Amino acid sequence: REGAVRTEKRSHIPITELRVAGGGSQSPGAMQITADVFGLPVSKPHVYEASGLGAAIDVAVGLKLHPDFSTAVEEMTHLGETFEPDQKRHALYNDIFERVYKRMYKKLKPLYTEIREIID
């Protein structure tokens, strides 16, 4: 969530929805938690293998089946299930984020740096 907050600040563009693909998108529980944590609707694509769909879109544009990527994406992708945030749970997660996570991350940052040094 912290990354999303930073992205919004830097871009000055609010994030209004999330799209999730891959393994986590197959878990209704994980999708609902994501919606609740971010306080945003979270949708998954109509296909499981989003990378395969991306490759198919590339091929479709390359073969001139669609005139451009925007058209190909619009015609070849569809939303699957959407999970709406539960505002009561979002308020709880937000409280944890503001009161605990932000402080915890600052205190752990030196340890993350040390791990990076060990790995490098």
Q: Where are the regions a protein language model picked out?
A:
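Glycine/Thr-rich phosphate-binding loops that ligate phosphate moieties of nucleotide
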Residues: 1-120
